[in-house]
């Protein structure tokens, strides 16, 4: 992705200032950025915060979205797209988009737009189903070891889905979806479990996350 420098893009520090807290599911390889003085100056320049640390009207609107994302009952990450239900409107979601320079953009979108944005961003979801793809096929230990020992060049398109549910006891789930040797796999890192699947299962799972009607939750069934 190209670098972005428009005023409707924000650094991680700017968003944490506006939200008053860290952003769920937004992680960094080494440590969280912490240049808050520069972030505050940027917010003042964008006329979102005053010199006296007060939110302007425009700043209040952006801060409301950030705080909605932080306080949502569930956060969903699909690679560099972060979602949370918008509590004020049914079927609306907050979308936090992350760019390669760790710039972010935040907005509200309908769940239909959310789905098509995901599909357009990650062509893996338009994969043509293969005759050797399964609904769910457990990979035995020997096959898994052979796959793990193969060159990284055998791995094609990759998608990560991460879910953080705040209801009751907080629960966090991570799924790695990837192509290898012309097959599609889903890996549950926390359970060290790998399944051969077809893309329809993955698409159904994602659509269920956004409240689309489906027959059953395939991914949850596979984890049982």
UniProtKB/Swiss-Prot annotation:
Organism this protein belongs to: Staphylococcus aureus (strain NCTC 8325 / PS 47)
UniProt gene name: essE
Subunit-level organization: Interacts with EssD. Interacts with EssG. Interacts with EssC.
Keyword line: Secreted, Virulence
Reported function: Component of the type VII secretion system (Ess). Plays a role in Esx protein secretion. Plays an essential role in the processing and secretion of EssD.
Localisation: Secreted
InterPro entries recorded: EsaE
Protein name (record): Type VII secretion system protein EsaE
Statement: the UniProt record of this protein carries the keyword Glycoprotein: no
Disulfide bonds: none
An example Gene Ontology CC term for this record: extracellular region
């Amino acid at each position: 992705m190209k670098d972005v420098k428009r005023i409707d893009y924000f650094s991680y520090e700017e968003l944490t200032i506006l939200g008053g807290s860290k952003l769920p599911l937004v992680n960094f390889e080494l440590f969280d950025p912490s240049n808050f003085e520069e972030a505050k100056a940027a917010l003042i320049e964008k006329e979102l915060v005053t010199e006296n640390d007060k939110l302007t009207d425009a700043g209040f609107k952006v801060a409301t979205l950030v705080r909605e994302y932080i306080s949502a009952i569930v956060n969903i990450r699909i690679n560099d797209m972060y979602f949370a239900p918008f509590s004020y409107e049914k079927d609306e979601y907050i979308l936090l988009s992350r760019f390669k320079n760790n710039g972010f953009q935040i907005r509200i979108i309908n769940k239909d737009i959310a789905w098509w944005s995901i599909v357009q961003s990650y062509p893996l979801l338009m994969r043509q189903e293969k005759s050797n793809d399964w609904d769910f096929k457990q990979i035995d230990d020997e096959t898994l070891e052979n796959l793990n020992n193969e060159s990284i060049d055998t791995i094609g398109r990759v998608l990560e889905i991460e879910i953080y549910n705040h209801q009751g006891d907080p629960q966090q789930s991570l799924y790695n979806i990837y192509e290898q040797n012309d097959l599609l796999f889903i890996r549950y890192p926390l359970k060290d479990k790998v399944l051969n699947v077809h893309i329809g299962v993955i698409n159904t799972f994602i659509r269920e996350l956004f409240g689309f009607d489906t027959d059953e939750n395939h991914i949850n069934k596979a984890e049982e």
